[in-house]
Amino acid sequence: VHLTGEEKSLVTGLWGKVNVDEVGGEALGRLLVVYPWTQRFFDSFGDLSSADAIMNNPKVKAHGKKVLNSFSDGLKNLDNLKGTFAKLSELHCDKLHVDPENFKLLGNVLVCVLAHHFGKEFTPQVQAAYQKVVAGVANALAHKYH
C-alpha cells in the first residue's frame, strides 16, 4: 500500500493510542452483528444469538484482539503486506474458506470503530489514511484467492 510520510505518521500516531483488546472485540462483534452471514465462520464461538450476546462473547473479544494484533504487524510492514499476511491468507482461503469480501467489511467496520473511539481526533485525513491501509490489508489477505 502506498502511503505518504504524513499518512504513515497519522496512522501510526493514532494506532499507538488504540486499546487493541477493546477495539478488536468491538470491531469483530460489530461485523457479526451488522453482517450476520459472517457468523457462519464462528460456529465454535458459542452464543451469537443477539447483539448483546455477540458483543459480550469472550471468544469474539479474544479473536478480535488476535485480529488486531495481526493488523498491528501489518502496520509495521506496510511495504510488504502480502508477505506479512501470506500465511493468514492461505489459512483463510484453503482451510477456513472465508469469503475474501469479508476482509473489506471488517476493515470498514474497524474504521468506524476507530472513528467512534477517537472522535474529533479521527480527522478526515486520518480516515483517508486508514481506508488505504484497511484496503491494502484486505487485498493482502485475499491474495491466495487469486
From Swiss-Prot:
GO CC term, one of those recorded: blood microparticle
Gene3D superfamilies, per database record: Globins
Name of encoding gene: HBB
Residues recorded as bearing N6-acetyllysine in the entry: 59, 82, 144
Job of this protein: Involved in oxygen transport from the lung to the various peripheral tissues.
Binding sites annotated in the UniProt record for heme b: 63, 92
CDD domains: Hb-beta-like
InterPro entries: Globin, Globin-like_sf, Globin/Proto, Hemoglobin_b, Hemoglobin_oxygen_transport
Pfam families registered for this protein in UniProt: Globin
Keywords: Acetylation, Heme, Iron, Metal-binding, Oxygen transport, Phosphoprotein, S-nitrosylation, Transport
Modified residues (Phosphothreonine): 12
Family membership noted in the UniProt record: Belongs to the globin family.
Protein's name according to its UniProt entry: Hemoglobin subunit beta
Disulfides per UniProt: none
GO biological process, one term: hydrogen peroxide catabolic process
Modified residues (S-nitrosocysteine): 93
Complexes and interactors: Heterotetramer of two alpha chains and two beta chains.
Expression (tissue specificity): Red blood cells.
The UniProt record lists the keyword Cytoplasm: no
Keyword Kinase: no
Residues with the N-acetylvaline modification: 1
Single Gene Ontology MF annotation: heme binding
Globin domain ranges (all copies): 2-146
Residue positions where Phosphoserine is found in the record: 44
Species: Ursus maritimus
